[in-house]
Amino acid sequence: MLRNTSRVLMSHFARANIPTPVNQPMLNYEVGSTHRKLLKEACAKFRNTTIDIPCVVGGKEIRTGDVQKQLICSDHNKVLATFHQANAELLKLAVENSMESKAQWESLPFEARSAVFLKAADLLNTKYRYDVLASTMLGQGKTVWQAEIDAAAEGIDFLRFNVKYAQEIYQQQPPANSAGCWNILTYQPLEGYVVAISPFNFTAIGLNLSSAPALMGNVVLWKPASTAVLSNWIVYKALLEAGLPAGVIQFLPGSGRLVGEHLFNNRNFSGLHFTGSTGVFNDIYKKTADNLVAGVYKGYPRIVGETGGKDFHFLHNSGDVENFVNNTLRGAFEYQGQKCSACSRAYIPQSLWPQIKDRLVTGVKSMKMGQSDDFSSFVSAVIDKNSFNNIQSYIEHAKASPDAEIIVGGKCDSSVGWFVEPTIILAKDPHYKSMEEEIFGPVLTIYVYEDSKFEETLKICDETSPYALTGSIFSTCRYAIETAHKYLKNAAGNFYINDKCTGAVVGQQPFGGSRASGTNDKAGSSLNLLRWISARTIKENFVPLTSFTYPYMIDPEN
């Protein structure tokens, strides 16, 4: 017993030297390379095989018989995978098993937990690399480079850097001790279980949402997006092969409604790690608040969410035109604008607009749109029919509106896949519909402002959208940059200067926004991990108290 207690305390202090994390180098998959050959083979394998994916509870694969399909979004007549949806009975079992598994997992020393995730990182970089890339490309519509920076590089970075951040947290101790006492901070996981709900657009996010709380000693129930089940299943298998014990992370594809009914109404619900739409997050937030008022929970659940965005590029008339154009083409249209950080509105000074317009139009027309596993494609299809219909509705609105003009793109074709051309809308009104509302597709709306109204337009940029995720200022004038800082300090949780508003790197740019974009708990940093632990202060006194009285009470005259 004493030895076990010693090991637990060791985990709180995290004295072991961990491997120093560095950002995972990205491969280019150039013609003739072995990497390109192996990735193409993996894509061909998944195109010609339908994978059947179970739920996993307590380490056991469970097939409920309620089967749904994940399609290849750029070729939607082809089924990439089938998956079994968790039902009410299974969700109840998952909660019970999680709570049964909790004590043993959280008692493992930090080094032992870390070893699981560090090994998983190496497995994703070797054995599982091409499978997770190919499944992300076909299932989620990512071209090879977009899959590489997500499913390989970012996913691996999350696993490695989170271990470093966790160690730094555990090493934080009170800086002072009064004479005769010792002060200790210990860090323990939350009292119940954590629910992870992940989106379709980043395989790495699904991995981080589930693994970050688990690294800190929590048990997790993970609901992956139905349009990203295959890639998420592959990273889950890597975690299991790395030694993740049964019951630590339960894998539960299925209905968001059922998850809400059964996982958020339980006394042991202690945290939510979420990435998805603002509307869904608001619904969950309200549900948990209502349950809290009703006395359902033991304590206050930790609610962590990264949601929508209406991200911007703002060009000052001193800005480098070529740099702005190239960063905007990438920021707006890579991955079909389906990054929560994607540039979807831009503000351009009138004096620079003619040359920028020509370059943007030329750039968009040169983009090849095709199958995601065609290595010459720059963009591919959007994720599903609902997304296609939503994006198309904004394009049709612009075509019919006297306040907007489509200057390039605008075609939509769902005959083979959910293809939407990269589209640029010129808005006469800075509050035009597509300047304000999140679209989540390859649609960029531009407002051209008078050069003399720079500050006025910055104010409009700040007040236009309810979101505050990412944004960029392009300028070579330091005064203009500082002015933008002043006006936009609350408009973007990740703010870029002369760079695109996408592409945050783990360990370099912690990611998250505020307002309607989420709780700004900064994935890829220790700030996020702090949400998954509860700190406990311990004071030990070494000097016995010999009297309860104080010196002021002693009167020598009495």
Swiss-Prot record:
GO BP of this protein: proline catabolic process to glutamate
GO molecular function: 1-pyrroline-5-carboxylate dehydrogenase activity
InterPro entries reported for this sequence: Ald_DH/histidinol_DH, Ald_DH_C, Ald_DH_CS_CYS, Ald_DH_N, Aldehyde_DH_dom, P5CDH/ALDH4A1, Proline_metab_enzyme
PROSITE patterns, alphabetized: ALDEHYDE_DEHYDR_CYS, ALDEHYDE_DEHYDR_GLU
Signal peptide: none
Site keyed Transition state stabilizer: positions: 201
Localization in the cell: Mitochondrion matrix
Family the entry assigns: Belongs to the aldehyde dehydrogenase family.
Role noted for this protein: Irreversible conversion of delta-1-pyrroline-5-carboxylate (P5C), derived either from proline or ornithine, to glutamate. This is a necessary step in the pathway interconnecting the urea and tricarboxylic acid cycles.
The protein's name in its UniProt record: Delta-1-pyrroline-5-carboxylate dehydrogenase, mitochondrial
Source species: Dictyostelium discoideum
